[in-house]
Design a protein with these regions (language model features):
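Short hydrophobic beta-strand segments
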Residues: 2-6, 157-160
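Internal, well-folded beta-alpha domain core
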Residues: 89-254, 258-260
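Active-site helix-to-loop segments that bind/position phosphate- or nucleotide-bearing substrates
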Residues: 4-91
Length: 260
């Protein structure tokens, strides 16, 4: 079993805490992407990133100075988005962290596919960015099926906790022999319909990854047992390869986890 999650835009380097234990598998490809970014003008980079002036200036400085072999932070500890806050890697004990190191994989537009303790530097490049790289029209074309092939070498079952942006690049090209199990987190809207809410899904995916790490397994019974504080498994809405979790109704006098 491998668990796939998305990266986060917010990244904070911390090379002085936990040392990386491995380097990204697709480091040469990342170096090529970096060289491609360095060929862009400041205005072209801002258009590519769709960032404000302050973020653009910060990331231009990164592009101009970054070294993919120095001042590295383990990937799991470098990302600081909502999903990673709810996963809470810095609070994990050794056994759950070791379990994640083996079973968790992080999709990345820049690095391709990362293990939790691969050493990385902060970057800004989403998988959906329209970056032409050599003869490839965008990053989906650039990565092609190589990320799927790398994942298929490791496992015959993938738990999909990634956003569609990354599952499209990594899971869609998988061979039919690899089983993909998707977790869906639904909330009830005021009109009674069920829908995914991006912020809540990020929270739930992070909590799910932590739950599995602390359990030390990701078998069907463990997946169904996940409640994640605000979630409960919905067997009547689920299928073998599509596990649905519903947001629990708020108790009287308390606020919901998220308001529509």
């Amino acid at each position: 079993m491998r668990i796939l999650i998305s990266p986060a835009k917010q990244m904070i380097p911390d090379p002085d805490s936990l040392a990386p234990v491995s380097q990204p598998r697709f480091l040469p490809e990342a170096q090529l992407l970096l060289e491609t970014l360095r060929q862009k003008s400041d205005r072209e980079l801002q258009s590519l990133w769709k960032t404000n002036d302050a973020l653009t200036a910060e990331n231009i400085q990164r592009v101009r100075t970054m070294d993919l072999t120095r001042n590295l932070t383990p990937a799991l500890f470098c990302y600081h988005g909502i999903q990673y806050q709810y996963l809470g890697p810095s609070a994990l004990e050794d056994a759950p962290l070791a379990w994640l190191s083996e079973h968790l994989r992080i999709g990345s537009g820049f690095y391709g596919l990362l293990r939790p303790l691969d050493g990385i530097v902060p970057y800004r490049l989403e998988m959906q960015a329209r970056l032409r790289v050599e003869d490839s029209r965008d990053l989906y074309a650039f990565w092609g099926d190589r990320l799927a092939r790398a994942l298929a070498e490791e496992t015959d079952t993938v738990l999909d906790l990634a956003s569609r942006e990354y599952s499209r690049a990594i899971l869609d090209p998988l061979p039919a022999s690899v089983r993909v199990i998707r977790c869906v987190f639904l909330s009830r809207k005021p009109d009674g319909t069920l829908a995914e809410k991006a912020t809540l899904c990020k929270m739930a995916r992070g909590r799910m990854a932590r739950f599995l790490a602390e359990a030390g397994q990701a078998d069907p019974d463990t997946l169904r047992a996940f409640d994640g504080i605000h979630w409960e498994y919905a067997p009547n809405l689920s299928e073998p390869d599509r596990l649905v979790y519903l947001e629990k109704p708020s108790r009287p006098g308390t606020r919901p986890a998220f308001e529509w």
